[in-house]
């Protein structure tokens, strides 16, 4: 490793900082000229989108122009804050303040197995509370929600049910369409555009449970630092990761780049899994299939099957445990990784991960 230096309610949103008067021609004009937006303008645009006042063409133009201009952390933070203001609220008194998320932007175009989904179960089985935010597949064959559904987990639970799942099972799943109904129009436009836009960054930044820690995958190396900047302003303990093979995960085929966010600062590192004894994998060994195939792979890995997929799951689970450890100012990088890797492996080999999945399935079907 080398260090290189649904809306909560209209009332809730009205309590936010005032958004300056703007217009789509003014805003899009700045973006097409390659200029950054004035403070508040990105928030104004997202308010128009979430309130249903933006037309599809305006949403599409904004999404693409923002990506081409390259957004700033401030702009992306405004988009995420407005989206969260419209999200269905979680019962804050039931959500622990040390929860983690393991999620990626998607958009890497590789169609791997659902590593973050499997890793989430392993992390929860290791004793770290997980509230995962996710959706169905946009471009791949199976998204995290698709695979969880094939495993038997009900994905359409509401806020109180997810909170109960977290408290009783150590894990919960926030299905994005269930928690962000006001984002529906933008979601449709995003699918129709068919290319990555600034909206790809918002999923990992808008978990309605607002976890303070996480392993966040970013398929876009040029935008990962921007995401890290948003998390830094929130005081999060997060590892934003980009596989140097293009994956929005910690990869085992080569090195990964990590933006370590802790105590409001961002450090950029190169991470080599070989330093911890992981064998190099071929990308083809990590490829997935449809939801049923990915669910079968998940059952095998959680049941103790060895191989490249298990290695990648353990690595990503350990990364989330490291991020969780970063909530403490006493956490040290190498010892945290050694601890995380051991806990992830034990969670699988002891049967704890497999048992947790079974409990989660039973709970979700009867809640």
UniProtKB/Swiss-Prot annotation:
- Residues bound to anthranilate 1: 104, 135
Query: What keywords does the record list, in alphabetical order?
Result: Amino-acid biosynthesis, Aromatic amino acid biosynthesis, Glycosyltransferase, Magnesium, Metal-binding, Transferase, Tryptophan biosynthesis
Please write the reaction equations for the catalytic activity of this protein.
N-(5-phospho-beta-D-ribosyl)anthranilate + diphosphate = 5-phospho-alpha-D-ribose 1-diphosphate + anthranilate
Residues at which anthranilate 2 binds = 190
One GO biological-process annotation of the entry reads: L-tryptophan biosynthetic process
**Pathway named in the protein's UniProt entry:** Amino-acid biosynthesis; L-tryptophan biosynthesis; L-tryptophan from chorismate: step 2/5
Q: Where does 5-phospho-alpha-D-ribose 1-diphosphate bind?
A: 104, 107-108, 112, 114-117, 132-140, 144
Give the EC number. 2.4.2.18
Q: Cofactor: bound how, per the entry note?
A: Binds 2 magnesium ions per monomer.
Instruction: List ligand-binding residues for Mg(2+) 1.
Output: 116, 249
A molecular-function term among this protein's GO annotations? anthranilate phosphoribosyltransferase activity
**Low complexity bias: start-end ranges:** 1-17
Pfam family membership, one: Glycos_transf_3
Which proteins does it associate with, and in what oligomeric form?
Homodimer.
Protein purpose: Catalyzes the transfer of the phosphoribosyl group of 5-phosphorylribose-1-pyrophosphate (PRPP) to anthranilate to yield N-(5'-phosphoribosyl)-anthranilate (PRA).
Q: What is this protein called?
A: Anthranilate phosphoribosyltransferase
Native source species: Mycobacterium ulcerans (strain Agy99)
List the top taxonomic levels of the source.
Answer: Bacteria, Bacillati, Actinomycetota, Actinomycetes, Mycobacteriales
């Amino acid at each position: 490793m080398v260090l290189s230096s649904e809306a909560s309610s209209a009332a809730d949103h009205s309590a936010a900082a005032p958004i300056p008067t703007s217009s789509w021609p003014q805003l899009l004009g700045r973006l097409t000229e390659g200029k950054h937006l004035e403070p508040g303008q990105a928030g104004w645009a997202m308010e128009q989108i979430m309130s249903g006042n933006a037309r599809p063409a305006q949403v599409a133009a904004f999404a693409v122009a923002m990506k081409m201009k390259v957004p700033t952390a401030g702009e992306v933070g405004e988009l995420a804050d407005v989206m969260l203001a419209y999200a269905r609220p979680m019962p804050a008194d039931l959500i622990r303040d040390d929860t983690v998320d393991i999620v990626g932007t998607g958009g890497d175009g590789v169609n791997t197995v659902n590593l973050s989904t499997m890793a989430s179960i392993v992390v929860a089985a290791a004793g770290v509370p997980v509230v995962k935010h996710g959706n169905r597949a946009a471009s791949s064959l199976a998204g995290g929600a698709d695979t969880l559904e094939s495993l038997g987990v009900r994905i359409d639970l509401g806020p109180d049910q997810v909170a109960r799942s977290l408290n009783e099972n150590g894990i919960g799943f926030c299905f994005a369409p269930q928690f962000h109904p006001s984002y529906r129009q933008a979601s449709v436009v995003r699918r129709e555009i068919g290319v990555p836009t600034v909206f790809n960054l918002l999923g990992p930044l808008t978990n309605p449970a607002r976890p303070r820690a996480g392993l966040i995958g970013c398929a876009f190396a040029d935008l990962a630092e921007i995401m890290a900047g948003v998390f830094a302003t929130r005081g999060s303990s997060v590892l934003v990761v980009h596989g140097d093979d293009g994956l929005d995960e910690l990869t085992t085929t080569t090195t990964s780049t990590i933006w370590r966010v802790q105590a409001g600062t961002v450090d950029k590192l190169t991470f080599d899994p070989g330093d911890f004894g992981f064998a190099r994998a071929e990308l083809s060994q990590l490829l997935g299939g449809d939801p049923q195939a990915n669910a079968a792979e998940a059952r095998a890995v959680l049941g103790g099957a060895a191989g490249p997929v298990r290695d990648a799951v353990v690595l990503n689970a350990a990364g989330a445990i490291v991020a969780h450890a970063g909530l403490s100012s006493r956490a040290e990088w190498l010892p945290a990784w050694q601890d995380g890797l051991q806990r992830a492996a034990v969670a699988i080999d002891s049967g704890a991960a497999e048992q947790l999945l079974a409990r989660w399935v039973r709970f979700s079907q009867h809640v």
